[in-house]
């Protein structure tokens, strides 16, 4: 995947990251019997974060000025695809996908010097983890309908409300919480606030597990939680703008993970088709199997090409609203189809609980919901292609 990326330093980095997975992460997984559906001990995650940070991988996607390697977005996509395709349970933590630098990288410009030192630099060093808390029980795609409130009380803000399905919350140290600070405004004034999750009144609840089986989501409840006003992130009333500033690139950066997962299912299907024997020979000789493999290969090539082009647009500073939505829509649906064909090729093995292909099928089904459903992506695309040039609309 992404074989056209031939910058020598990046080629060496890709190889080094995969060696790290094979030589350091897989032994940890074997020793502790960790798979993607295990409850990951926080001390183990911190070891991985810190070690990845020491090696320069954890912050690789950040600018050099912030201690990163200044990877382009297309290079970051290639690394993410490699890690997802590796099948390692701890692979998402190499780049800090679930609470590390990628969660905050494009928002660091909004941080005050104090916030950088107290919250974000520890994230970059692998010492702290964060999560982005927007979704609520009654507020999914309709982000402006959130009800979590932050009310001024002298130099403090008092926060009340509930956040739902927050990715990375089970192992986060603090959250970037979207709060209503002026419910009377039209639309409601939304402000981002940095909230330590060990404060009195904060409860992180793990009452559900998504169909992927991964313990990576939780609800966060705030009951009269007091935080200093200096924890306002990005300015009062700028929360929605801040959230939208990350959404397009965030949608794009989910796509290489889908691609890597689908690629792993495709590779497994190739191996299985060559080794599984029926009626006197390998099932790969049957045209029905060949056609499924051909469709999978074509879909993966199309997805990789679309991701690479969209990432190149992002690197050039282009407006990604339509492109990122189209990419997320297309890649999520095609990669799920690849996983479905992989299950079909594997037969009864493919529907056995815990088989890698079965796990990949469940993971990829979720991506048609996460970070904006397929229907929301279609809405965004339709708005972009139907509105007059220059019209400003949110994603």
Residue ranges and their predicted role:
Residues 119, 146, 162-164, 205-208:
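Short beta-alpha junctions and helix-cap segments that line functional grooves
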Residues 91-114, 140:
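N-terminal glycine-rich flavin-associated loop
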Residues 156, 160-205:
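A short core secondary-structure module
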Residues 126-134:
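A short, Trp-centered hydrophobic/proline-enriched beta-strand micro-motif
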Residues 131, 147-149, 174-178, 192-194, ...:
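Conserved hydrophobic/aromatic beta-strand scaffold that supports enzyme active sites
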Residues 145, 198-228:
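Flexible, small-/acidic-enriched active-site or ligand-binding loops
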Residues 71-73, 142-144, 168-173, 186-189, ...:
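Short glycine/proline-enriched turns and hinge-like loops at secondary-structure junctions
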Residues 1-89, 110-115, 122-127, 152-157, ...:
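Alpha-helical interface subdomain recognition
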């Amino acid at each position: 995947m992404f074989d056209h990326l031939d910058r020598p330093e990046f080629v060496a980095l890709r190889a080094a990251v995969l060696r790290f997975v094979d030589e350091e992460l897989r032994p940890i997984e074997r020793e502790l019997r960790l798979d993607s559906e295990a409850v990951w001990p926080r001390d183990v995650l911190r070891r991985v974060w810190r070690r990845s940070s020491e090696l320069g991988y954890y912050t690789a996607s950040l600018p050099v000025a912030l201690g990163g390697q200044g990877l382009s977005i297309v290079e970051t996509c290639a690394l993410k695809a490699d890690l997802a395709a590796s099948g390692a349970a701890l692979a998402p933590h190499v780049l800090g996908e679930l609470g590390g630098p990628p969660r905050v990288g494009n928002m660091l410009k909004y941080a005050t010097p104090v916030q950088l030192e107290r919250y974000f630099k520890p994230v970059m060093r692998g010492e702290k983890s964060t999560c982005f808390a927007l979704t609520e029980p009654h507020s999914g795609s309709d982000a402006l309908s959130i009800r979590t409130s932050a009310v001024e009380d002298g130099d403090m803000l008092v926060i009340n409300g509930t956040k739902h399905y927050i990715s990375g919350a089970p192992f986060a140290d603090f959250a970037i919480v979207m709060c209503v600070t002026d419910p009377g405004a039209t639309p409601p004034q939304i402000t981002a606030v940095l909230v330590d999750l060990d404060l009195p009144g904060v409860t992180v609840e793990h009452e559900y597990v998504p169909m992927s089986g991964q313990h990576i989501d939780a609800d966060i409840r705030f009951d009269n939680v007091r935080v200093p006003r200096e924890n306002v992130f990005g300015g009062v009333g700028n929360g929605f703008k801040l959230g939208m500033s990350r959404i397009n690139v965030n949608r794009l950066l989910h796509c290489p993970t889908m691609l890597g997962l689908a690629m792993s299912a495709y590779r497994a299907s190739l191996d299985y088709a060559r080794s599984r024997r029926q009626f006197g020979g390998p099932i790969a000789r049957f045209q029905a199997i060949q056609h499924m493999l051909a469709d999978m290969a074509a879909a993966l090539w199309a997805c990789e090409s679309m991701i690479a082009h969209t990432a190149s647009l992002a690197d050039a500073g282009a407006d990604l609203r339509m492109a990122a939505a189209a990419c997320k829509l297309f890649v999520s649906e095609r990669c799920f189809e690849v996983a479905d064909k992989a299950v079909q090729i594997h037969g009864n093995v493919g529907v056995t609980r815990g088989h890698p292909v079965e796990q990949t099928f469940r993971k990829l089904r979720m991506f048609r919901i996460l970070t904006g459903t397929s229907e929301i992506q279609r809405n965004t695309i339709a708005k972009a292609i139907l509105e007059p040039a220059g019209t400003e609309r949110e994603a």
